[in-house]
């Protein structure tokens, strides 16, 4: 893609997200989401591969339908109460429509089916954008309207997302699909706590973006797309393979890595609000996600790759990609747990 066009698309995507995050008017929030969607569609389809074209078409249809549903909810609210302020929602159907529209944009269960299929058809860096940056604007709207969102609806969607995200990733051999189900499960943890402690949802979102960026940048750097490719990761660099192992374990929420802190705080908050059965069930079902993380780490860093050559490291050209961003994300992925109390005060 032409660098100028690429810069314009990325700038439009950033502008759309910022516009939505700073909006309290229905139309401006909707406009930001539409700008975001229209900017990323050419990025998804830039390889001109049939899978990329299919992925961009699916993404457009899903996002257009959810945007139309959100605008419809705004029109109903304006017709009934004469206000376009997104924080003033008093009608129950409007609340349900808005929550359903934003849940569709995020890929929450039971409207999650589009996310794994789209990620499978795009390059790794584009998949990284879809699973991180594209979650910011809808989540910002949910956090803005947290006191009007139906709590039973968010608890149900969050619980289903944790279960489906864990079970869906168990039999996956494609790393991008595995990361899609990982995204669904993590979004489930965020949406469960949003009507109770929205600041904890924001904290979880920031950490999720950090962990996912670290993991998928390593996949991009080593050109790993399947579990079979991950087996060869230690041949490229044992340090990278070990870093990939720690990043996946952090995504799984194992202490003493940074990924333990959001799950720990969310479970503590649920128990404080007398939601002990929900907290217990979510803690148990997250073991499904941990299972496929452990399987991937075992394959990538704890097994020797098949080799027909007498040397340990395979021949390769000097990599020309920068690892500065990967280094920063990896440090945050591994060492944020000790300062968790400071960040959540």
Curated annotation (Swiss-Prot):
The entry's function note states: Core subunit of the mitochondrial membrane respiratory chain NADH dehydrogenase (Complex I) that is believed to belong to the minimal assembly required for catalysis. Complex I functions in the transfer of electrons from NADH to the respiratory chain. The immediate electron acceptor for the enzyme is believed to be ubiquinone.
UniProt subcellular location? Mitochondrion inner membrane
Q: What is this protein called?
A: NADH-ubiquinone oxidoreductase chain 2
Q: Which reaction does it catalyse?
A: a ubiquinone + NADH + 5 H(+)(in) = a ubiquinol + NAD(+) + 4 H(+)(out)
What is one GO biological process annotated to this record?
mitochondrial electron transport, NADH to ubiquinone
Major place of localization? mitochondrion
GO annotations of cellular component type: mitochondrial inner membrane
Species source reads Varanus melinus (Quince monitor lizard)
Q: How does it sit in the membrane?
A: Multi-pass membrane protein
| Highest taxon of the lineage | Eukaryota
Which segments cross the bilayer? 1-21, 60-80, 110-130, 149-169, 179-196, 200-222, 240-260, 274-294, 323-343
Instruction: Identify its protein family.
Output: Belongs to the complex I subunit 2 family.
Would I find Glycoprotein among this entry's keywords?
no
Q: Which Gene Ontology terms cover its molecular function?
A: NADH dehydrogenase (ubiquinone) activity
